[in-house]
């Protein structure tokens, strides 16, 4: 910086420099990228193995004897959303509530009429209902990532193999929920816990003492998945919702492999929690 004397040195007093640093930090915090949990964690460089390594988890395979088809003709994220939302409908959640995120996305891109037509077809687990659910989930990205990230035609009308797989994975998910339930909150949020770095996000399900995320990946959980769980838990504890105070373990369930992974929160290191709260979520003091 060029000082008042025109030389290449900062001639301000220490107090002036400290005040300027404080203003700059305040500005950077206010203008830092704002994003959902899933977007934020993709940008995080984690230590080797991740903040929450998979070896800390206990793995249980539920071993559904009925196999899935190897090929699906819609994007993997859409398959996962369809399984999630249809599982909620199967448990009695009104379809409009279960599909609220893609419905909001459709409004953002001026396709509400199309979305409403598809929603009217979601009436159970018929082929027509599952196809409509997949097409409706195509609008989800417009809501979660912004209209600019939505692309018309990305999701095609799914074929028989995809419809069968979605239906079977919904059945597996319902069986899993019966095993770990009772489910006390589906689509949980973190009101009061969001920060300038994590401004939105919602999870899959809370049981009486567990926080679970649902996946349909073809691969084992990676550090991004486990970090997502850790971020959800800490956001929840900083939120206004007392349900998170009862969480004693975090878990992932993959309906494609019919496998669950869970870790007691007491097994998670304090240093990892502190780093995630401070560096990932943006809480000033951690813990």
Regions found by a protein language model. Give the residues of each.
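N-terminal, charged low-complexity regulatory/assembly segments
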Residues: 1-123
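Active-site metal-binding core of divalent-cation-utilizing nuclease and nuclease-like domains
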Residues: 68-75, 179-206
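A non-catalytic, helix-rich entry segment at domain boundaries
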Residues: 113-182
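Conserved catalytic cores of phosphodiester-cleaving nucleases, focusing on short active-site segments
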Residues: 203-218
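Short Gly/Pro-enriched loop/turn and capping motifs at secondary-structure junctions
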Residues: 218-220, 257-258
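Active-site-adjacent loop/helix micro-motif of nuclease/hydrolase catalytic cores
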Residues: 219-228
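Metal-dependent nuclease catalytic cores in nucleic-acid-processing enzymes
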Residues: 227-250
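Domain-level recognition of nuclease-like catalytic cores that cleave nucleotide substrates
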Residues: 251-287
